[in-house]
Amino acid sequence: MLKPLGDRVVIELVQAEEKTASGIVLPDTAKEKPQEGKVVAVGTGRVLENGERVALEVAAGDLIIFSKYAGTEVKYEGTDYLILRESDILAVIG
C-alpha cells in the first residue's frame, strides 16, 4: 500500500462520465479531468515552524473535490492514484 509523507494524501480517482446527458459517448480526449476522488491514505501531517505536527483534516474513506491540475498521477499494482497536498483539496463531500 502507498503511504504518503507529511501533508500528502493518496486518492483513488472517481472516473469521469463516459456519456453525456443526451447519450453521446465521449472519447478519452474529450473527457474532463476528474476532480473527485476517494481518500485511501493520508500522511502524518504538516510540521509547523515551531516543530509541532498538525494532523490532516481529511481521513481515509473521505470523498473529496480537489483542484483540477493538482497532484501527481501514479499507477500502483494496476490501479491509478493521485498524490496531492492537503492544500490542493477544496472540499469534503458529505
From Swiss-Prot:
| Record-level GO BP terms | chaperone cofactor-dependent protein refolding
Q: Does the keyword Glycoprotein apply?
A: no
Arranged from A to Z, the UniProt key words for this protein are:
Chaperone, Cytoplasm
InterPro entries assigned to the protein according to its UniProt record, in alphabetical order:
Chaperonin_GroES, Chaperonin_GroES_sf, Chaprnonin_Cpn10_CS, GroES-like_sf
Q: What is its main location?
A: cytoplasm
Q: Which organism is it from?
A: Bacillus cereus (strain ATCC 14579 / DSM 31 / CCUG 7414 / JCM 2152 / NBRC 15305 / NCIMB 9373 / NCTC 2599 / NRRL B-3711)
What quaternary structure, including any partners, is listed in this protein's UniProt entry?
Answer: Heptamer of 7 subunits arranged in a ring. Interacts with the chaperonin GroEL.
Q: Where in the cell is it found?
A: Cytoplasm
Supply the NCBIfam families for this chain.
Answer: PRK00364.1-2, PRK00364.1-6, PRK00364.2-2, PRK00364.2-4, PRK00364.2-5
Q: Function, please?
A: Together with the chaperonin GroEL, plays an essential role in assisting protein folding. The GroEL-GroES system forms a nano-cage that allows encapsulation of the non-native substrate proteins and provides a physical environment optimized to promote and accelerate protein folding. GroES binds to the apical surface of the GroEL ring, thereby capping the opening of the GroEL channel.
Question: What GO molecular function annotations does the UniProt record carry, in alphabetical order?
Answer: ATP binding; metal ion binding; protein folding chaperone; protein-folding chaperone binding; unfolded protein binding
The name of this protein is: Co-chaperonin GroES
